[in-house]
Amino acid sequence: SWLLDARWSSTASRMIAISSLPNHCRRLLSAAMISPETKTAWTYSELNSEANRFSNAILDAGIIKGGVVMFQLLNCPEFAFAYIACHKTGTVSCPINFRLSAGEIAITIEDSRPTVFIYESINKDAVEQALKLSKFTPKMIIMVDEEGAAPIPGTVKYSDFVKNASAENPNLNWNLSIYDETTRLYTSGTTGRPKGVCITSINEVLSAHDVMIHFPFSSEDKSMNTTPWFHRGGLHSGGLTPTFYAGGCVTIMRKFDAALTLKYVEDYKLSFIIGVPAVLERLTEAQERNGRDLSTLHGIVTMGSPLERAACMRYQRVLTPKIFNGYGTTETFWNTFLRPNDLPEM
């Protein structure tokens, strides 16, 4: 699991994964995750229980080690529950772009052959068509319902799927390794069809440490990633992985909204927000129209496209002088990362 402290086992000659989530449950009473949209918050204990319910539900449904849980979700609590559950159970979390067409969804389903597929009610029509196109059908298909919609025939609502599942830590009949595949991300397909990128447990642990060292990031921090969580930058650049690993708090932004982002910084005292340069441009425009108190920010982290000098100077003047710039956040994670003091002279 990526939620681990890696320690040497006295009963085996290899590194084993010891989950740090129970430690956070015992020592951290503050929120692990906040959904401003639904005005809901989860402590680490509550987050652990929700992840355990999904873990036990997929185990009861027959998933085995290495089985794939594919989910096409906007940023939402169920994304976090499923992501953690996969690490707990030795299964593979496979988040895919919620903007994919039916044909593209079918391609990823055929390629990864997921045991479990989770979709949002707003994508119901595309998913239903994809299931007809695909030559492979997942064993369990689950709908996250945001709109009171009826699920596709033969599928089940998420709330019903986990309703009777145990909130206790799952019992596994297999061992976990830091070299297990824990997450699979799909490329944009610029050289043909999308291709799955394997990310192992140790990849995710080291990505979390990278963030904790370079931001730096700790259990005192509160983050909000304004980008979708289905790519490396969304998950690992101040997203779910490093924030939960460090014991900080994730604030969910379902879909980017500049005015709401600034409001959440002020209301929830956020310390880090993450987005592409286009996001920073819209934040700057919104801040110039209606200024918010951004004094709690330790930094704004940008990625995804070049950061121009003149634009960077404007963002530093209007938002915060603490602008970070990373490169390589689609599937690989940073291969270049500039902290505020690393930026060229302005």
Each model region followed by its residue ranges:
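Conserved pre-ATP/AMP-binding loop-to-beta segment of ANL
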Residues: M143, K163-Y186, R193, P216-K222
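AMP-dependent adenylate-forming
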Residues: S19-T43, A150-P153
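Structural core segment of the AMP-binding/adenylate-forming
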Residues: D60-A61, F81, K88-D160
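Gly/Ser/Thr-rich phosphate-binding loop
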Residues: L270-G275, E285-M346
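Conserved AMP-binding/adenylate-forming core of the ANL superfamily
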Residues: A32-C76, A80-I84, S101-A106, E110
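Conserved AMP-binding A3 loop
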Residues: A41-S45, T182-L206
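Flexible, low-complexity linker/hinge segments
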Residues: T11, E128-A130, A149-E181
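Conserved AMP-binding/adenylation subdomain of ANL enzymes
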Residues: V205-K222, F230-F272, R282, A286-E288
